Design a protein with these regions (language model features):
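A metal-dependent, Asp-based hydrolase signature
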Residues: 45-81
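Short, acidic loop-to-helix structural element flanking the phosphoryl-transfer center
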Residues: 57-58, 75-112, 122, 147
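Short helix-capping segments at alpha-helix termini
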Residues: 25-32, 70-75, 105, 129-133
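A short acidic, helix-capping loop that chelates divalent metal ions and anchors anionic groups
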Residues: 22, 44-49, 120-122
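Substrate-recognition "cap/lid" segment bordering the active-site pocket of phosphatases
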Residues: 111, 118-159
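An amphipathic alpha-helix signature
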Residues: 20, 33, 37, 57-65, ...
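Active-site neighborhood of HAD-like aspartate-dependent phosphohydrolases
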Residues: 1-41
Length: 159
């Protein structure tokens, strides 16, 4: 039997440091990134709990717009694009490449899973230099359910 390990991407494999710089630039406070990302994950959880689905890119943008409104700042289309496009170029954490190679050497399959679109997943893995270390990668867009909903469904199959 082949064994596989599934990896979340953002904050697990990929370092949000580039996003941190964007939030420091626009809010003078890097902590705002954590607030925004928490709001984004919360929004995806609520949407999923309602049995609905919204593309994660659109949800990211809407959450960013809300954050700017809450902060009394204007979000131009250029600024929005600048911040959100940083997602495409997140570096892998220092230990990721060595760890993935070790898992591959042990014969384990490695699979990346993300709320982002499939094109975005491939672009992120490519830009981080780790695409070739994965046997497969998936986006929740294929099933129109966020990962938390997918995990719930998978868990019910094991009962």
């Amino acid at each position: 039997m082949k064994k596989a390990i599934f990896f979340d991407m953002n904050e697990t494999l990929l370092n949000l440091s580039l996003l941190k710089k964007q939030f420091e630039k626009h809010f003078e406070d890097a902590f705002v990134l954590k607030y925004w990302f928490t709001k984004l994950l919360y929004a995806s959880t609520v949407v999923g709990a309602m049995g609905d689905y919204t593309n994660f890119g659109a949800l990211s943008g809407a959450t960013l717009e809300t954050l700017f409104v809450e902060s009394g700042k204007e979000l131009t289309p250029e600024t929005k694009n600048e911040i959100l496009s940083a997602f495409r170029h997140l570096p892998a954490y220092e230990d990721v490449i060595v760890s993935l190679k070790r898992l591959k050497a042990e014969g384990l399959k490695t699979i990346a899973v993300s709320n982002s679109s499939l094109a975005m997943v491939k672009e992120q893995l490519t830009n981080a230099g780790i695409l070739d270390l994965f046997d497969a990668y998936y986006s929740v867009d294929a099933v129109k359910r966020y990962r938390n909903g997918c995990y719930t469904r998978l868990g019910s199959l094991w009962r």
